[in-house]
């Protein structure tokens, strides 16, 4: 079980959730009452984008982000499994472009 801190000062988000390594971060957040943006839930759009501040994830199921965006730390929370404790900035769709 990993601890995932979700933060976004502008949106008033600062909460830590528990997420097993076999559950998508978005699903775990919803189960624990955290309302995050999403649309397709399939890794094919950018609505749920977050930025990994600390930690690591497996998001091999995503098909939207390009290599540069991934190297800059962007993740899609709807298809990202945690592989360590993480700090993630939420609501990052606009920052992608």
From Swiss-Prot:
It comes from the Eukaryota. [2Fe-2S] cluster binds at residues 40, 45, 48, 78. Binds 1 [2Fe-2S] cluster. The keyword Protein biosynthesis does not apply. The keyword Chloroplast applies. Residues 2-94 form the 2Fe-2S ferredoxin-type domain. GO terms for cellular component: chloroplast. Its cofactor is [2Fe-2S] cluster. GO terms for molecular function: 2 iron, 2 sulfur cluster binding; electron transfer activity; metal ion binding. InterPro entries: 2Fe-2S_ferredoxin-like_sf (IPR036010), 2Fe-2S_ferredoxin-type (IPR001041), 2Fe2S_fd_BS (IPR006058), Beta-grasp_dom_sf (IPR012675), Fd_pln (IPR010241). Belongs to the 2Fe2S plant-type ferredoxin family. Ferredoxins are iron-sulfur proteins that transfer electrons in a wide variety of metabolic reactions. Forms a complex with heterodimeric ferredoxin-thioredoxin reductase (FTR) and thioredoxin. This is Ferredoxin. It comes from Cyanidium caldarium. The gene is PETF.
């Amino acid at each position: 079980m990993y601890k995932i801190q979700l933060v976004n000062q502008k949106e008033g988000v600062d909460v830590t959730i528990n997420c097993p390594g076999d559950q998508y971060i978005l699903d775990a957040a919803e189960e624990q009452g955290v309302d995050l943006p999403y649309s397709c839930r399939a890794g094919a759009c950018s609505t749920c984008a977050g930025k990994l501040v600390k930690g690591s994830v497996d998001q091999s199921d995503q098909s939207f982000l390009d290599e540069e965006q991934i190297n800059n730390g962007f993740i899609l929370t709807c298809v990202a499994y945690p592989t360590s404790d993480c700090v993630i900035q939420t609501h990052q769709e606009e920052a992608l472009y």
